Amino acid sequence: MLEVVAVLLRSGERFLLCQRPEQKAHGLLWEFAGGKVEPGETKRQALTRECREELGVEIAVGEEFLELTHVYPEVTVHLTVFCAELRSGRPQALEHRALRWVTAVEAGRLPLSPADVPILRQVERLQNKNKMEAHGMKSKVYFTREITPEKVVEMLNALNAPLTGKVAAKVHSGEEGNQNFLYPEFWRPVVEAVGATVVECNTAYPGARNTTAKHKKLLEKHGWTKYFPVDLLDAEEPDLELPIPDGLVLKKNLVGKDIQNYDSMLVLSHFKGHPMGGYGGALKQLSIGCASSEGKCWIHSGGVSTDREKFWDNIAPQDSFCEAMADAAGSVVRYFNGKMAFLNVMSNLSVDCDCCKVAEDPCMKDIGILASLDPVAIDQACIDLVYASDDPGRAHMVERIESRHGVHTIEAAAKIGFGSREYELVEL
């Protein structure tokens, strides 16, 4: 294993990135300055030397920022990242092609070395946390007890959502025979309000949605094509691979390639129980919902298999599955880079998902509609509303959520850092 150090060198909200020379391994990719720890050196000594050789500066090495291991095909790297301050000199590209002081947003647009992606993610997490704490902010989740198509539009308007360009509206088309899914007539006003295309993906297991031909017939039968343009994102191969270098379980996610045709996404979720995930909401729509049929196998297996024929033979341990869903959801959130909005409707509250041909009837009375720009917060709020309910059927729903460790998906998503479990519930 190769011991490597890197430096997080800041100037206000910006930090220094270096572009590797074209002729070197991973040429033209951007990275944090640093290098190998030589025999006899401490990590701090190595970092001081590397900054002197690479950048022509003297630094004061501060606290440890992050420690990680990254496996390249040719070598495994153990990387320790330190914060540091400039003591003297101005950074120069002595061993790099170029240097650039960037914000986290600007860094996210650059091609980063794979081992450096987790460093950027940690910077983003801390910046978001610090900003929210500094302003006493929590993620806003809007809530209404009135469940109507018109109210859905009102909830979306409350978000002032950044849905620009070509908008995808992710729905659940409903398995054939399922009586609980939300019909296209319910979603029609909000989809039309943003001029969206309804998008879906094929399933991995047998049913009416596991091939493009069958799924298209079902979409027509359920009325989706009557009202909207509809796009099966994985109708044609190859899938689009979204990298997850810092994933808890997955290192990549496989989504329908046509997701590339959209600039933003409106995620429309029917909150309910789920036989495998404990519950289904925004995080499930982002993960399993946006995954291609092979991508669904990949998530359910915890990154072991994409073989649809052996789907049920490769089911991951439950916590790994929940973490894989969180990994996959985070990759889609990062892909759209903030251009997303989430609506969860808590009606037809069965313990079973809309993917079940034979689903239990609702066990609880309807609760309401929630809206947020934070997929973690909106799912946490739905869970909290279930637990706070005095409905006699609450126990059945809670048992389903807890027996499948459903909240662990939310915990994992918050740990990854693309949303927060802390929220402010604003009732409209």
Description of each model-found segment:
Residues 1-15, 36:
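Conserved N-terminal beta-strand and adjoining loop/helix that marks the start
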